């Protein structure tokens, strides 16, 4: 594991946490799916020594092991004084599951029609600064469209992406932050091997000692 990657990720989290306090007057939110990437982000946030909260979007289709892991992980974090929140999906003002959503949409989600992401996976954090475990190595699309820092306006065409902490567009980015959710992807430049190496070196027991992924 390249320790420079760890330090860069920690610096990004500290920058995001500071910006969150300045612009939103609230702690940074670290989102977690219960998977390997977001679990690394939680561990890095703890190591960074920042003030943060943790949020999980309950998709209704997670494996039981993931649900059990989230419960145990949230118990561990709450015992350390870290606020944790679970968001349950709503559609048209009503609680939904994947199975109740499909009849309303008249089709299951597909690679091209991925309504499940916006309703089940990406809700919450409006008007706040959040982190995700998104990485460029996951797909060509993410390599082309995602960055270290992002704004998430309702119109995707107005999205601003920064890949340099000193980017000339930072002033525009910060202006847009006042109106929209902002995102930091601290491990965006990590490879799959980097993630697994970090888990093995830093949080193996915490993740795998009866907790699952």
PLM regions: where:
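Nucleotide-activated chemistry modules centered on ATP-dependent adenylation/adenylyltransferase
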Residues: 1-213
